[in-house]
């Protein structure tokens, strides 16, 4: 995820570059997305000139509809990115009329004291831009995500001539992609992927299901091309695949490909004449690919001797679920084709030779590596030294770097930084109660006891015990034993005041968790409902209830 801020200290004017998300893993159950805490820039929103977006990947625009309402500033983006963020705001019923400014490719916007030039690069999505940010202190090149693709197939080529000119004009600092800094050679071209995918399509004789990143429109066009060349129809499966296709056509791309057919109609086409292009290349539980493999998709069926083509890489952290998906397919007699056995995917980020080209074009005085893990940043620092950059600067989240001509760049301050976790539609911190409780429940289960007692400490009826997620095989035995422990604990208390009642609740909580630990090895999240009842006559009761979570 990305959120960068550039500011001029003397007049306190700021711009933001990108507002992205990352996707949560199993360590934060119930949370889907995480985005950078924008608190630092919210405090400066009166001096914020705008948000500038480099391209439309989720780690660069995914948080825009969550963060923008707190800022209410102008947004600057090229046409394809603009179409996708308009949809994001529509989904949340947020009106940005008058705020979104569509920027033409290779053009410049003036946000005094900044002048920002959009420079076309190549990446794994349409309209990726590097930003040449002119400031009174000097020029900065913010690369965004990029690579050097000599044949991107769709969209413009990397504007290397303009990059060379920018380098000759002088660049104070380059903020540069580090993702593939460990990879030798070049990242590869979409044209090479097309050639190899066509060979795969020509070899296969049954139903073909291709899964790829929906945002890679060049890859999408390649699958359309291969389908047409081999006499097959194509059907798009998955919401994001349809969304990207629609956005691309709206912006003038994909005009020459065959029209896709509805997946409901595709069921009537013979196996050897249909290709499905679907979402779920990372094994996402609700992705189309996962549903197809589990035979729960309403329209797409897969059977023995069909082929599934994974035209994508495995994102770190997804290995286990993807290998499980691959194995399930193989068990069903389905051929699995991936970058492990065919050259059918290339990265969208620069390998070392691509980086070398950029360094030679830009000739920056300083380099700030970004976009990658800590180990990538360190390796990129070493690469910058190898390229004779005078000032490689290592940064961490929240670092404020001072850039000024003639001076060594330095981290001179720290901005408050952190992560915001979207829990449902509520932004929370990682240590929020809801996340802590959910983690506890996922590991240890949940137990609840409801008890009615008189002021003298007599239990009215038996305690009502319920639990979820505990490895209990003899329910009656477990519940009976816990009831006895609850009764034993209650007998040690007299309930003359509220404090004693609260103390009893705490004691019951300990009793329940201790008993569960002894019997199951688990200390569940425990809820005690304690009702103090006053019985004045057989048919009339008044109760006060207390509930505590722990």
Question: Residue locations for each model-derived region?
Answer:
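His/Asp/Glu-rich metal-coordinating catalytic cores
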Residues: 1-52, 57-269, 287-301, 320-322
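Histidine-centered active-site/metal-ligand motif
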Residues: 55-60, 123, 142, 344-352, ...
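Hydrophobic packing residues within well-ordered alpha-helices of enzyme cores
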Residues: 64-67, 85, 380, 384, ...
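Conserved hydrophobic residues forming the short capping helix/wall of the S-adenosyl-L-methionine
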Residues: 89, 384, 516
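Conserved beta-strand scaffold positions in the cores of enzyme catalytic domains, especially
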Residues: 100-102, 173-175, 308, 336, ...
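Hard-cation-handling environments
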Residues: 182-311, 315-317, 321-340, 344, ...
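C-terminal tails and terminal domains of large nucleic-acid-associated
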Residues: 501-532
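Single conserved hydrophobic/aromatic residue that forms the stacking wall/gate
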Residues: 533-550
């Amino acid at each position: 995820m990305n959120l960068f801020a550039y500011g001029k200290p003397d007049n306190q004017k700021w711009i933001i570059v990108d507002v992205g998300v990352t996707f949560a893993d199993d360590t934060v159950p119930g949370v889907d997305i995480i985005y950078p805490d924008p608190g630092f820039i919210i405090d400066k929103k009166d001096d914020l000139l705008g948000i500038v977006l480099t391209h439309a990947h989720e780690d660069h625009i995914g948080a825009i509809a969550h963060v923008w309402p707190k800022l209410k500033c102008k947004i600057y983006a090229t046409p394809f990115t603009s179409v996708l963020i308009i949809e994001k705001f529509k989904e949340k019923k947020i009106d940005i009329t008058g705020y979104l400014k569509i920027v033409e490719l290779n053009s410049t916007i003036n946000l005094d004291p900044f002048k920002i030039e959009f420079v076309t690069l190549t990446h794994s999505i349409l309209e990726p831009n590097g930003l040449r940010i002119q400031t009174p202190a000097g020029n900065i090149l913010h690369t965004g995500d990029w690579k050097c693709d000599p044949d991107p197939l769709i969209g413009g080529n990397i504007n290397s001539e303009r990059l060379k000119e920018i380098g000759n004009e002088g660049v104070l600092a380059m903020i540069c992609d580090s993702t593939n800094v460990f990879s030798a050679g070049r990242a590869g071209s979409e044209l090479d992927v097309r050639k190899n995918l066509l060979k795969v399509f020509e070899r296969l004789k049954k139903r073909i299901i291709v899964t790829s990143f929906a945002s890679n429109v060049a890859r999408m066009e390649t699958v359309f091309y291969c389908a047409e060349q081999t006499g097959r129809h194509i059907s798009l499966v998955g919401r994001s695949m349809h969304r990207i296709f629609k956005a691309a056509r709206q912006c003038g791309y994909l005009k020459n490909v065959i029209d896709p057919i509805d997946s409901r109609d595709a069921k009537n086409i013979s196996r050897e004449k249909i290709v499905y292009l679907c979402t779920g290349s990372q094994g996402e539980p609700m992705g189309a690919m996962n549903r197809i493999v589990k035979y729960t998709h309403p329209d797409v069926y897969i059977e023995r001797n069909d082929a599934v083509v994974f035209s994508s890489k495995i994102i770190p952290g997804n290995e286990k679920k993807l290998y499980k998906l691959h194995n399930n397919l193989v068990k069903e007699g389905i051929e699995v084709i991936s970058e492990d056995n065919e050259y059918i995917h290339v990265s969208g980020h620069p390998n070392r030779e691509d980086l070398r080209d950029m360094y030679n074009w830009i000739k920056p005085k300083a380099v700030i590596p970004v976009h990658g893990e800590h180990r990538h940043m360190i390796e990129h620092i070493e690469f910058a030294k190898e390229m004779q950059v005078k000032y490689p600067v290592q940064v961490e989240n929240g670092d404020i770097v001072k850039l000024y001509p003639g001076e060594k760049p330095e981290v001179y301050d720290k901005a408050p930084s952190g992560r915001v976790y979207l829990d449902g539609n509520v932004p929370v911190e990682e240590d929020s109660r809801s996340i802590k409780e959910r983690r506890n429940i996922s590991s240890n289960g949940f137990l609840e006891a409801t008890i009615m007692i008189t002021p003298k400490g007599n239990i009215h009826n038996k305690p009502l015990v319920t639990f979820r997620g505990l490895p209990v095989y003899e329910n009656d035995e477990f519940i009976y034993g816990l009831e006895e422990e609850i009764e034993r604990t209650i007998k040690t208390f007299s309930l003359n005041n509220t404090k004693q009642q609260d103390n009893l609740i705490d004691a019951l909580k300990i009793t329940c968790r201790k008993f569960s630990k002894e019997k199951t090895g688990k200390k569940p999240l425990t809820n005690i409902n304690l009702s103090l009842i006053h019985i004045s006559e057989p048919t009339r009761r008044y109760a006060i209830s207390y509930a505590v979570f722990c």
